[in-house]
Amino acid sequence: RSLVVGKPAAQMLIKKNATVTVCHTMTVDMPSVVKEADIVIVAAGRAGVVDDSYVRPGQIIIDVGINVNEEGKLCGDVDYAKVGPIVDAITPVPGGVGSVTTSVLVGHVVEAAEKASK
């Protein structure tokens, strides 16, 4: 439901005629709901909240989360070690979506600077 990831991602996918289900903290039996999806975009804001009970073979998992774990290392919202062997594809954290986000932000900064200089 967040304005940063949840709503924009849902709107983008709906415009492409995807059937979208949005889960949140009040979703009943979330693991069962998530297992039904072919593509799962995770932006929960909690390290490792999505584990192997949420997934099945054939899924693509896009982990947007950026967290610091107990050891001080960056990690996502998905428990990569448990989920990775089950699903068909998963984005890593670090090195996944964050790299794309940085590139897009740099592009926007350059575009804004060019507009400001005119």
Task: Please give the residue ranges for each predicted region.
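Rossmann-fold NAD(P)-binding glycine/threonine-rich loop
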Residues: 62-117
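Glycine-rich phosphate/diphosphate-binding loop of Rossmann-like nucleotide-binding domains
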Residues: 1-60, 73-81
